């Protein structure tokens, strides 16, 4: 007689398929909490720059971590600048100055020009 523990196939190691709804004791279905990430936006930019290139989930995790880190650094520096100047609002000027302080040389120049372009596009669309 076969052992019941060995007859059922073992789940694959590292399989990470999330169940969309978990079953509660009283029979009601509960939605799983959503994990926010920048993966959709990173993927869109990747396809603009290199249409034929893909990205692994590990690399996407690193990119997501990088974007979160840069966001926190810029937000923190902009907050400090607003506080130093006795302002209660973070404007595009604080963000721009924070970017200039945090990013080195040519990278800061490109970031500022892209940011200015994005703000101009946003204000013209309103």
Swiss-Prot record:
It comes from the Eukaryota. Monoubiquitination at Lys-35 (H2BK34Ub) by the MSL1/MSL2 dimer is required for histone H3 'Lys-4' (H3K4me) and 'Lys-79' (H3K79me) methylation and transcription activation at specific gene loci, such as HOXA9 and MEIS1 loci. Similarly, monoubiquitination at Lys-121 (H2BK120Ub) by the RNF20/40 complex gives a specific tag for epigenetic transcriptional activation and is also prerequisite for histone H3 'Lys-4' and 'Lys-79' methylation. It also functions cooperatively with the FACT dimer to stimulate elongation by RNA polymerase II. The modification N6-lactoyllysine is found at residues 6, 12, 16-17, 21, 24, 44, 86, 109, 117, 121. The modification Omega-N-methylarginine is found at residues 87, 93. Glycans are attached at residue 113. The modification N6-(2-hydroxyisobutyryl)lysine is found at residues 6, 13, 21, 24-25, 35, 44, 47, 58, 86, 109, 117, 121. The modification Phosphoserine is found at residues 15, 37. GO terms for cellular component: cytosol; extracellular exosome; nucleoplasm; nucleosome; nucleus; protein-containing complex. The modification N6-crotonyllysine is found at residues 6, 12-13, 16-17, 21, 24, 35. The modification ADP-ribosylserine is found at residue 7. Belongs to the histone H2B family. The nucleosome is a histone octamer containing two molecules each of H2A, H2B, H3 and H4 assembled in one H3-H4 heterotetramer and two H2A-H2B heterodimers. The octamer wraps approximately 147 bp of DNA. Found in a complex with PPAR9; DTX3L AND STAT1; the interaction is likely to induce DTX3L-mediated ubiquitination of H2BC9/H2BJ. This is Histone H2B type 1-H. It comes from Homo sapiens.
